[in-house]
UniProtKB/Swiss-Prot annotation:
Binding-site residues for 5-phospho-alpha-D-ribose 1-diphosphate, renumbered to this chain: 81, 84-85, 89, 91-94, 109-117, 121
Classification lineage: Bacteria, Pseudomonadati, Pseudomonadota, Gammaproteobacteria, Pasteurellales
NCBIfam families: trpD
GO process terms (BP): L-tryptophan biosynthetic process
Binding site for anthranilate 2: R167
Sites where the protein binds anthranilate 1: G81, N112
Protein name per its UniProtKB record: Anthranilate phosphoribosyltransferase
GO molecular function: anthranilate phosphoribosyltransferase activity; magnesium ion binding
Amino-acid positions noted as binding Mg(2+) 2 in the UniProt annotation, renumbered to this chain: D225, E226
Length: 333
């Protein structure tokens, strides 16, 4: 059996090819890998360090196995973070997705329940009255009509359930933590992706290149999986097959450095109140700045190159309260 060969390769500390990795993860989501085998394989991958081929193979397998989403022909993007930064901030990427859509961008936001913070994207949106389990057809209609869809990971990646007991028992990060942001079932070719460690910038950029993604901006902001208001943000930008590495500071967006403490979040209900106030034009300077900086880079994925002008536009949109209208419309689907 081919799986035996794959296990032998892993346990000899050798890397899998992209095809072998795809075959292994196909077997995982089909429930064909015993928990003991999966546990051993995940640890073998982790200790050696997952290669770009292994990550890309896993992504390909998981996207093929996912429940279908009717992806549109027009350009659209995803904005997502790895989580795991331990900072417990408000849901900046979810707020940025809503604001971006209110400015005319098309955003299919992939998200899940919280893993390490108190409030994940789906926890927050549920609290705000959004049907996170809406059908793929309804989500696509929302994307067409209001520029925003929420693509709930658990609904589309049903095969993940086979890995849950092992992941919970291992209590450590595995390749599954890396895969989450890469497996949007809508197959977004553009993405703003926040990572919990600067060491992940290069592998994510290289994996997105291997997967022929059009334009990805991968960020790590001084300890956050977001663009930072409190310090430097390291960036890996993939465009047309080329990867560029650079740093951004709040000044590049027209802002001063602000303390991170003022972005602390809480339980879902608490975060929902904060995000509602923010979208209605009642956010604090720090909250507005965080969303403006992240949305400014989201706009860059659609050809708006001047991030300072983008940030100004976002601040004006927040002050107007129009972003809240987009959220209200989303609750109707």
């Amino acid at each position: 059996m081919r799986l035996d060969q794959i296990f032998a390769t892993l346990f000899n500390n050798q890397p899998l090819t992209q095809e072998q990795s795809a075959e292994f993860f196909r077997a995982v989501v089909n429930g064909e890998v015993a928990p003991e085998q999966l546990s051993a394989a995940l640890i073998a991958l982790k200790l050696r360090g997952e290669t770009i081929d292994e990550i890309a193979g896993a992504v390909t397998a998981l996207l093929t196995a996912a429940q279908p989403f009717p992806a549109p022909d027009y350009p659209f993007a995803d904005i997502v973070g790895t989580g795991g930064d331990g900072a417990n901030t408000i849901n900046i990427s979810t707020a940025s997705a809503i604001v971006g859509a209110s400015l005319g961008l098309k955003i299919a936001k992939h998200g899940n329940r919280s893993v390490s913070s108190k409030t994940g994207a789906s926890d927050l949106l549920s609290c705000l009255g959004v049907d996170i389990n809406m059908s793929a057809e309804n989500a696509r209609q929302a994307l067409d009509e209001i520029g925003l869809a929420f693509v709930f990971a658990q609904k589309y990646h049903t095969g993940f359930k086979h890995a849950v007991p092992v992941r919970q028992a291992l209590k450590t990060r595995t390749i599954f933590n890396i895969l989450g942001p890469l497996i949007n079932p809508a197959h977004a070719k553009r993405q703003l992706l926040g990572v919990y460690s600067p060491e992940l910038l290069k592998p994510y950029a290289q994996t997105n290149a291997r997967l022929n993604r059009e334009h990805s901006i991968i960020v790590h902001g001084s300890g956050l999986d977001e663009v930072a208001i409190h310090g430097k943000t390291q960036v890996a930008e993939l465009r047309d097959g080329k990867i560029e590495y650079y740093e951004l500071s709040p000044q590049d967006f027209g802002f001063d450095v602000k303390p991170l403490e003022n972005l602390r979040g809480g339980e879902p209900r608490e975060n929902a109140e904060i995000i509602t106030a923010l979208l209605q034009g009642r956010g604090t300077d720090e909250q507005n700045q965080a969303v403006a900086m992240n949305t400014a880079l989201l706009m860059k994925l659609f050809g708006h190159e001047n991030i300072k002008q983008n940030a100004e536009q976002v601040l004006a949109q927040l002050a107007s309260g129009r972003a809240f209208d987009t959220l209200v419309k989303l609750t109707a689907y």
